[in-house]
Amino acid sequence: MKKVMSLLFLSALAAPAFADECTLTVEANDAMQFDTKALSVPATCKEVTLTLTHTGKLPVAAMGHNWVLTSTADFQDVATAGMGAGPDNNYLPKDDARVLAHTKLIGGGETTSISFPTEGLAGKDLTFFCSFPGHWAMMKGSFKVG
């Protein structure tokens, strides 16, 4: 009985730890930089919640940022196509299946969050980036599941 109680106690402590591993925070600034070049979550995460905070002061029209996830093979084509999509579409091609997840564009002092499933992403070569025109070449990084 003592062992069962100990296991129950430990499993109760482990649940929040697993939840935290599936929650990511990224900051972007007015210098066109994310605060990280690599993000990862364990394969045990069925869903990821990502929060993007724009720590700068410039408005969305001048220095907007978002967070977009694609396969690395699709990254450049999606980023290029997004430039023509305009700000109303978050500089992303509308309904493009190559976009695996994305936040909306935000300006200085703003925060946005998204949640997305990880099914089928484990072991894939993935890239995250900002699709605001001119940003994607500098504001990018790798994303790994597992």
Indicate where each model-derived feature is located:
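Sec-dependent N-terminal signal peptides
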Residues: 4-13
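Sec/Tat signal peptide C-region and signal peptidase I cleavage site
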Residues: 15-19
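Extracytoplasmic/periplasmic copper-protein system
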Residues: 20-29, 73-92, 133-146
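N-terminal edge beta-strand
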Residues: 21-47
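Short amphipathic, basic-aromatic surface patches that mediate peripheral association
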Residues: 52-57
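Short, hydrophobic/aromatic beta-strand segments
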Residues: 59-66
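Beta-strand signatures of extracellular beta-sandwich domains
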Residues: 66-70, 129
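Extracellular/periplasmic metallocenter environments
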Residues: 101-146
